[in-house]
Regions:
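Flexible, glycine-rich loop/tail regions that form catalytic "lids" or insertion modules at the edges
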Residues: 181-184, 188-357
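Catalytic or ion-translocation cores adjacent to nucleophile or general acid/base/metal-coordination motifs
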Residues: 25, 167-170, 356-357
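Catalytic alpha/beta active-site cores
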Residues: 1-87, 92-93, 111, 118-124, ...
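Structured core elements
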Residues: 34-36, 82-85, 122-126, 140-141, ...
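Flexible glycine/proline-rich, aromatic-decorated loop/lid segments
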Residues: 30, 71-77, 114-127, 135-167, ...
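Short beta-alpha connecting loops at secondary-structure transitions
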Residues: 1-7, 44-47, 84-92, 126-138, ...
């Protein structure tokens, strides 16, 4: 959705998601999430925090509808759900966790009769990659610190802090250590966070929570009028919304309407944007020999497993035709089949994604 990387026909893709959920429930798989419902890539592609929350939650609710329609017990498959959001600098990011948890808990309790555990929304926060800038790039650590503070004050279950040089390249060991130090200092030294829920009762936090929740629900209504998440996907609602909001952000950044210190305000006329070329960073690339080695290894694997692979692919196609659990079959055949072979078989039996124009 955000990365524009839909591959399979939607029906096929959702059927496979249901197959995975069914496999986990039937085999009582615990302590492992079969899906991390992600809003991070939606945010990075340009969406604002409200749209990030709305599209992510609506995806999760769609999964619940589909899995329940297959007869799966929500209390059993929801224990293997996790969530993933981005935190930027806007004030709404301070409450996307509590808003998402409130909407999710009410929906699970009142609409689906789910127990207490399934009402809980376990989420990971990563600081915003697109908020990092190559101008005055050392200041990115300050932005990341504030974003991490948002996450911890909003009771995120886990946190990833980006390195300051990710604005222009792969981070170095030193910048990664500094990014980890941000978390450690906030967790171990910053006294305010010793309070379990420091924003509780705050006027601005409560106001933002109610405001963001209302706007998320409005987006739900817009998608509902288009036939739900799947109907909205067919008419590019989500993708268009993400692109429009990304364009607005870039426009405001360039006009200075959205101030970014060191980039469009309080700039140093003698300071220039930096790139990876300005640093002694060893970039690892595959040379021709390594590429040929991987290709040869792949061909050798396919040759050695040709007969079993053919049988496995045929079994997968037959399972697809009969509507059986594809994930269960894939767990058997991946020892003898490549990802490419399995993907091609799924294309042939289920079709590719075709975007409406």
């Amino acid at each position: 959705m955000g990365q524009n990387t839909l591959v399979f026909n939607l029906d096929t893709a959702l059927k496979m998601m249901g197959d995975v959920a069914e496999f986990y429930v039937d085999n009582d798989v615990r302590n492992h999430y079969f899906v991390s419902i992600s809003g991070y890539h939606i945010d990075e592609a340009g969406a604002n925090p409200i749209t990030q929350s709305a599209l992510t939650l609506s995806n999760g609710l769609t999964y619940v509808e589909l899995f329940k329609a297959r007869g799966l017990d929500a209390d059993k498959f929801l224990r293997n759900f996790s969530w993933f959001f981005s935190n930027g600098m806007d004030p709404e990011y301070a409450v996307i966790g509590r808003v998402s948890r409130r909407i999710w808990a009410i929906a699970m309790r009142d609409l689906y009769g789910v127990g207490e555990r399934g009402q809980k929304l376990k989420y990971h926060i990563q600081s915003s990659g697109r908020s990092l800038h190559s101008q005055e790039f050392t200041w990115n650590d300050y932005r990341t610190t504030l974003q991490a503070l948002y996450a911890l004050a909003d009771n995120a279950n886990s946190l990833h802090t980006n390195s300051r040089d990710e604005a222009f390249g792969t981070p170095t060991e030193d910048t990664v250590r500094d990014a980890v130090a941000i978390q450690l200092i906030l967790a171990k030294e910053y006294g305010w966070l010793r309070n379990e829920n420091p924003l509780q009762g705050s006027f601005i936090a409560e106001f933002l929570t109610n405001e963001v929740e209302e706007r998320v629900l409005r987006i739900f209504e817009e998608m509902h009028s288009r036939g739900g998440v799947l109907g909205a996907l067919e008419v590019n609602y989500q993708r268009n919304r993400i692109q429009d909001e990304g364009m607005i952000y870039e426009h405001r950044k360039h006009t200075g309407e959205t101030p970014i210190v060191g980039v469009n305000t309080f700039t140093d006329p003698e300071s220039e944007s930096v790139s990876a070329d300005d640093f002694d960073i060893e970039v690892t690339r595959s040379d021709v020999t390594e590429k040929k080695m991987v290709i040869a290894r792949n061909e050798k694997f396919k040759t050695e497993n040709a007969k079993k692979a053919e049988e496995g692919i045929q079994k997968l196609k037959e399972a697809a035709r009969r509507g059986e659990n594809l994930f269960e079959v894939m767990m058997e055949i991946v020892e003898h089949c490549t990802v490419g072979q399995v993907t091609q078989a799924l294309f042939e039996s289920g079709g590719k994604f075709r975007r409406n124009m």
